[in-house]
Amino acid sequence: MGKGLNILFVSSELYPFAKESGIGDVAFALPIALKELGHDVRIIFPKYGAVSEKKHKIHYVNRLRDIPIKMGKKYESAAIKSSIITNAKVKVQAYVVSNDFYFDTRKGIYHNPKTWEEYPDNAERFIFFNKAVVETCTMLGWVPNIIHCNDWQSALIPAMLKDLYPNQFKKTKTVFTIHNFYRQGIYDIKEFERTGMSQSLLTDFKFKNKFNFLKGAIRHSNFITTVSNSYSKEIIKDKEFSNGLNIVLKEKKSTFVGIRNGVDIYSWNPKKDEFLKYKLKSDLDDFKSKNKELLQKEFKLDLDPDIPIFGMIPRIGYQKGTQLLIDAADKIFEQNIRIVLLGEGDNDLKNALRLVADKYPDKLKLRYEFNEPLSHIIEAGSDFFMMPSQYEPFGLNFMYSMIYGAVPLVRNTGGFVDLAIDITKSNKKGNAIVFDKYEVDDFVNAIERAVNLYENKDLYKLIVKKNREYDFSWKKSAKEYVNIYKQVLREPNKENDENT
């Protein structure tokens, strides 16, 4: 096996190519960190229509131009292209799965970007992707020690390796990371036929009379992780946000842990950030004031440095606290604050937010899109960054905010339980404004505490300065993943887990 491991990282998103959630950030940063530790890491992801081949220097791999993929009774062709990701220290090979029908002709990742409706054939699209991933390895003659899969979009691979490729990949082990337990890949049971897997495996994917991608990954992966310790505990016991699938996860609790996400300190570095006109030099106050003014101009806000700006960059949905913001708006805007919100998502919630913005046109500013450069400007220009989530697997923006000098305001759930220390309770150790109940009054009280903190300039600046001293790099977490990889590789092969 040599000193380094051969690792294939499978993701439906990859920054800077295609990103809709934190998975895209993790898929960039974790493989880079593993590469820096001396491992042969490669990434594979789909080529969506919005991905520019010219910009990202994506090119064909001659022997991978036309791979036939059996989809039920028909065949579709996959062309595997190549690119790289880099942090200027190391480079990681990135394979790009191309197919005109499933990916290349569609601008969105999971949704139609114009309507925000989920593509009706997402099950078929990602069955194709899973098959193409494994076929790419066989065509390359490359057998990874570890295939690391992420969320439901790559959840079929652990079972496929055992059922369809038992000889080629008998030494390969699988690790599966749950980034969001609520999104499970739930489709009509008939979709299972497209996988080509044995009908005897259907029970491992069947849940509540539906084809559940995630259930199969839980049953067949050698090890399962999620993105924070507290979230791992929540989803084991929480029926509400697991669709009841926590009972299946409990069966694998001896091979299930939470590992904290890290920050890609190459992309999220205010001293070198390519998206910032005003980068951090020696004066943190100057950095914040210039970026705040830029943010005010971008969103057509009054150029008043004394009014606190609260930034939000949510996926607009019920998970991220959008409804709570709507319900609390009248009480929130009794305070002299400004909120800027950048995001995309549920159309009903977007319409409801527009009504609030119409009522408070000088206080709430909306931008409905995915915009990576603007997200960096919001972090740099905001005084506070709000994540009033109903549940939160991790919350990468908590760490981005601390690095960029915006004090987080969060609800005490999921990954925030591990990260957030309430300033109100501890001025010396506090790093965030924290509220407990997913209720209007608790949320409004948190806003009021934030405003009071902002008016105490000395304490506010002290907390901003202290927050920047945290080490959020991937190094420690990457080593934890390597330990898991080595652990599962030491274990003898089993035809099936005892629970399947």
Label each region the model flagged:
Residues M1-T500:
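Catalytic cores of nucleotide-sugar-dependent glycosyltransferases that transfer UDP/GDP/TDP-activated
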